[in-house]
Amino acid sequence: MSTALADPLDTLRPLDVGATRYVYYSLPALAASLGSDLERLPFSMRVLLENLLRHAGDGTVATADLAALARWDAPEREGAEVAFHPARVLMPDSSGIPLLIDFASLRDAVAAQGMDPQAVNPRIPVDLVIDHSVRADHTGTVDAFARNLACEMDRNAERYSVVRWAMEQYDALRVIPPANGIVHQINLEYLAPVVTTTRHGEELLAFPDSLVGMDSHTPMVNALGVFGWGVGGIEAATALVGQPVGLLVPLVVGCRVSGTRQAGVMCTDIVLTLTRVLRTAGVLGAVVEFFGPGLAALSLPDRATIANMAAEYGATMGFFPIDGETLRYLAATGRDPAQVALVEAYARAQHLMGGGAAPAFARVVAFDLGSVHPVLAGPSRPEQCVSLPDLPASFRHAFATGAEAAPAGPRELRHGDIVIASIASCTNTSNPFQIIAAGLLARNAAMRGLTAQPWVKTSFSPGSRVVTAMLDAAGLTAGLQAIGFHLVGYGCMSCGGGSGPLPDAITAAIARDDLAVLGMLSSNRNFEGRLHPSVRGTYLASPPLVVAYAIAGSVLHDLSRQPLGIDAAGAPVHLANLWPSDAEVTAVLGAAQSPDLFRRNYAALADGGPGWTGLAHGAAPVFAWDPDSLYIKRPPFLDGVGATLPPIADLRGARPLLLLGDDVTTDHISPGGAIPAGAPAGEYLLAHGVAPAEFSTYVARRANHEVMVRGTFANIRIRNEMVAGSEGGLTRHMPDGAIVTVFDAAVRYRAAGVSLVVIAGANYGCGSSRDWAAKGTALLGISAVLAESFERIHRSNLVGMGVIPLEFPPGVSRRSLGLDGTETIDLLGLADGLRPGMEVTARFVRPDGAARTVPMLCRIDTAREADWVRHGGILPYVFRDMISVAPVPVPAGA
């Protein structure tokens, strides 16, 4: 970049680090000029303040916004909209490839206007990590990794060819090929610079790294003091084309950490307990910033585990300030010493180093590390904490089977059995202490002659290659393999619904006896239907506990007092006999890990091997769509979109497509796992000649809108109150009352010209960022969602697709109104113009003509979001914005 730096507020200052001179926009200088106290500002908000200051000269940031944020006690700052400019965008392939497809369709639309399609190009750096597509088809053998990788490349050749095309077209795109790890762990260990630089003529500008990530676990990088959170691909598109992301200045809740952990307590135990505490405290949409004396007892990987689960405790971010542990971790993971020196010098100059007096928080939640004991969470929510002795009762309460623990020895599959046990997820495989502990426990168990029960499908899918290199160096790989935990891939796998098939005999036994069987994962979420269609529930646990429960084989074993099994000498083996001491774990870890281990394993990150580099791909600036492809189809979101903005009208005579309860997840709305043969998406694939064995997953087919719209609200565990007593994607078509699939009902309503809404309870859209939960909603013809409350990312995604989110007033709900789905609904006031926080009148009319009127809060939160909805979504908004400026002609000869 060669443009000179603007300095309208006279805050540009030099910073000498070694032999290099940088410049930076000084927060202390700004605070002095405004007469504000920088030390009162939470550290996360200091990073945001610098972002606003750096863009104060480009016309997107008002001086009043800077002043309001800097005066942290000013009443107008909280909830105010500011323009945030992320330094980069991070995306996994699950949401990244659909975004690349959206960009390809935008190029088509721009080219149709006579403009150069290459004008559609990312304006800021974007990293795409391919991690969501690999499945655990093969497990339990030393060649499982190679076989799963071969299957992945074969299944996804069409999808990956899109990525190869995009790599040729988009200069700002960096791609991490398959089989390298999970996006958030790679971001933590390698990609994140913490402080980044850009050159402006002779000046080298230093500023904090920041990002938006197209996955709800993006806040994992908050552990490094990096400002970033999860958004949908819909919203990320605006950042990629160079527009700021509209951000409401959040509530910042301090979490004061004290004490030290008890012996044998893993960080998984800490984060699951903390998730329950923060959910109870209520931090929805807030930034949780950690401080206090207990931070000294948390390693950077511990902090990353805690920050990773911000979405699970409902926060936008889980932020840790930079401190000495941050600098130690950067050095330990092989970062350049000059970069580590820059991070320290910059953080000190900008008052971004933690450890001093606590800033001013909206409120403080106390958390004592010493109060934590080993726990699990489940069977369907991450905040459902349960201690080891209480696990059998938790299962019986959830599934009411009356099951009892089975005797040891050969037997039939039973209620409470664990059929999938997986050490997976960036949440915990990024934590070396926990992985070494799992390896030591497995080694100890193998030495006693124990192994996983035969009905348990075991797998190990770490988030980076460093993990397996560390286990090899520690001599622990063989022990894990002896229990059954062979490497199956580097990717999300079981955590994201890619657990692969169960053996036919297991599946048949589950179906025959209607068994409530379970999964045991070292993961971050366990929503219904996510892991496997045959698995009724999932418990989250630390990696060593996953190994232990694979050996026990059932959640009806109380591992706090019952043995895991019997050794070769006939002696009972208890968990305490196998559990390694903290001192042993620390010693083994210290000998196995080094900065060079990280450097070696990240040296060839972008290579990909011949299976990747040899993929055929087009070279033209517009993508060559294959009309016969069932993986890649041109999306319809710009079909019929012209230069003229259509008017917004009131909604009259709309029908509810679904009537849903509380805590509807984006997995319920848009499942990511295997596509069932009897579902509308499966029937579509069958009709197009695809055998059920080749259906793959919804994640893999996200670039085919025909599959995805049929998969919307098709989760096998979703419960629509319009069809009482049933599970799955069914609804009642009105007024005839016929029970049909959600997709079929939507088709019938569209043919009749009937508008649609969804009515739901509290916490609607929690879970994954999953933009297809909003895209599918829009493609079904749903104009609005009426709920008691919304989770942050899904609310934003709905707005980004032109769907209006409306909240019932406090004390009013579908139940208090007695709604049953037979009503018609009018939404009045929309035609008067969309405004943030406006009131919309909802009128519910029963079949007998009786009507109730309710004032609804329109959850369009910012003026920018109102623009998106007026345009019918972000993509039409970006398209119209591009064609409204001076056109970029197609180059001669193109």
Task: For each feature predicted by the language model, list its residue ranges.
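N-terminal amphipathic, basic-rich helices that act as targeting or association modules
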Residues: 2-151, 298-336, 627-670, 675-676, ...
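Long, structured ligand/cofactor-binding scaffold of large enzymes
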Residues: 57-257, 269-272, 374-377, 396-485, ...
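Terminal amphipathic helices with adjacent charged low-complexity linkers/tails
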Residues: 85, 103-158, 289, 295-402, ...
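Conserved short loop/turn motifs at secondary-structure junctions
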Residues: 91-96, 290-297, 316, 325-333, ...
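Mobile "lid/hinge" segments at catalytic clefts and subdomain interfaces of large enzymes
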Residues: 200-347, 353, 437, 442-454, ...
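Extracellular/luminal Protease-associated
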Residues: 258, 291-298, 524, 746-747, ...
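Acidic, glycine-rich flexible loop/linker segments
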Residues: 567-584, 795-868
